UniProtKB/Swiss-Prot annotation:
<dbReference type="GO" id="GO:0044038">
    <property type="term" value="P:cell wall macromolecule biosynthetic process"/>
</dbReference>
<feature type="transmembrane region" description="Helical">
    <location>
        <begin position="3"/>
        <end position="23"/>
    </location>
</feature>
<comment type="pathway">
    <text>Cell wall biogenesis; peptidoglycan biosynthesis.</text>
</comment>
<keyword id="KW-0133">Cell shape</keyword>
<feature type="transmembrane region" description="Helical">
    <location>
        <begin position="221"/>
        <end position="243"/>
    </location>
</feature>
<comment type="similarity">
    <text>Belongs to the glycosyltransferase 4 family. MraY subfamily.</text>
</comment>
<keyword id="KW-0472">Membrane</keyword>
<comment type="function">
    <text>Catalyzes the initial step of the lipid cycle reactions in the biosynthesis of the cell wall peptidoglycan: transfers peptidoglycan precursor phospho-MurNAc-pentapeptide from UDP-MurNAc-pentapeptide onto the lipid carrier undecaprenyl phosphate, yielding undecaprenyl-pyrophosphoryl-MurNAc-pentapeptide, known as lipid I.</text>
</comment>
<dbReference type="GO" id="GO:0008360">
    <property type="term" value="P:regulation of cell shape"/>
</dbReference>
<dbReference type="GO" id="GO:0016780">
    <property type="term" value="F:phosphotransferase activity, for other substituted phosphate groups"/>
</dbReference>
<protein>
    <recommendedName>
        <fullName>Phospho-N-acetylmuramoyl-pentapeptide-transferase</fullName>
        <ecNumber>2.7.8.13</ecNumber>
    </recommendedName>
</protein>
<keyword id="KW-0573">Peptidoglycan synthesis</keyword>
<keyword id="KW-1003">Cell membrane</keyword>
<feature type="transmembrane region" description="Helical">
    <location>
        <begin position="169"/>
        <end position="189"/>
    </location>
</feature>
<feature type="transmembrane region" description="Helical">
    <location>
        <begin position="115"/>
        <end position="135"/>
    </location>
</feature>
<keyword id="KW-0132">Cell division</keyword>
<feature type="transmembrane region" description="Helical">
    <location>
        <begin position="51"/>
        <end position="71"/>
    </location>
</feature>
């Protein structure tokens, strides 16, 4: 436990030092920052804010987790595969950000390219991680999927990678939402005695807390796709490594809600010839524009943050209660 906590502290300190250096480099190199293409007027002031800051907490977390696990004899197949997903999905996000920032391609990677790279990572993860017989745990009951587990694994990794990416639209929202989710998985890992996975979790929590100091409202830096895609993939990988896949539907309710809102909006828009359910999706923008109803007073970014963090925290506590108190 001491090793895991130490890893989190080291990552926190390294990120705390690394982010200001990253921002300074960004400014000196006169790199064009985040472009704003949203209809939320208050976001227009954010144009030019340095992005790709997720690169800092990703590098520090992966390196610290790797070396701490290696030198404490806690490096395992599961640790290796979680770090692999972080690196590969981080590279996908980096390429996406690179095309947007340096090549001025607003779309970045097109959907097919991004999906292909994410699926590739999912296939490699499936082939090498310790699966335990391709068994899916559904509320504690084993479901034998056999060969079909690979389709679940791909759906899980790609789905939650993109879901966290959608959540990253308000200052600080995604970073602390993921911290809350990781805390819940840290408890599960500790109870299961999987200290190797706990080490990776605490290393990333440290990195995200260090990043949040510069990412809260008003954000001095954004994590970019390099951070959000990696974090979503990590959560999915951890839920599978702990054989508690179903828990991510509750622990990750914020990401599920954000993604579902987009799917509902697009489907309803097509079916009704242009009508909308929400003012704007992902749904955090709906709250920004008009509160819960969409027709009330706009919510500040802090209010949106605390609402979603509260939902995520309650969902995480509910999951732990279901697992260990019922």
């Amino acid at each position: 436990m001491f090793i895991s906590i130490s890893a989190g502290i080291v990552t926190f300190l390294l990120t705390l030092v690394g982010i200001p250096a990253f921002i300074q480099f960004y400014r000196k190199a006169q790199i064009t920052g985040q472009q704003m293409h949203e209809d939320v007027k208050q976001h227009q002031a954010k144009a030019g804010t340095p992005t790709m800051g997720g690169l800092v907490f990703l590098i520090t977390s992966v390196l610290v987790a790797f070396f701490f696990a290696l030198f404490s004899s806690q490096f395992s197949n599961n640790v290796g595969m979680i770090l692999f997903i972080l690196v590969l999905y981080g590279l996908v996000g980096f390429l996406d950000d690179f095309l947007k920032v340096f090549r001025k391609i607003n779309e970045g990677l097109n959907p097919k390219q991004k999906l292909a790279l994410q699926l590739l990572g999912g296939v490699i993860f499936y082939l090498f991680y310790e699966r335990g017989g391709d068994i899916l745990s559904v509320f504690g009951y084993p479901v034998h999927l056999g060969f079909f587990y690979i389709f679940f694994a791909l759906f899980w990794l790609v789905g939650f990678s993109n879901a966290v990416n959608l959540t990253d639209g308000v200052d600080g929202l995604a970073s602390i939402s993921v911290v809350i989710s990781l805390f819940a998985y840290g408890v599960i890992a500790y109870v299961q005695g999987q200290m190797d996975i706990l080490l990776v979790i605490l290393a990333m929590i440290g990195g995200l807390l260090g990043f949040f100091i510069f990412n809260h409202k008003p954000a001095k830096v954004f994590m970019g796709d390099v951070g959000s895609l990696a974090l979503g993939g990590m959560l999915a990988a951890i839920s599978m490594a702990l054989h508690q896949e179903w828990t991510l539907l509750i622990i990750g309710i914020v990401y599920v809600f954000e993604t579902t809102s987009v799917m509902m909006q697009v489907s309803y828009f097509k079916l009704t010839g242009g009508k909308r359910i929400f003012r704007m999706t992902p749904v955090h923008h709906h709250f920004e524009l008009g509160g819960l109803s969409g027709k009330g007073n706009p919510w500040s970014e802090w209010k949106v943050d605390f609402f979603f963090w509260g939902v995520g925290l309650l969902a995480s506590l509910l999951t732990l209660a279901i697992l260990y108190l019922m």
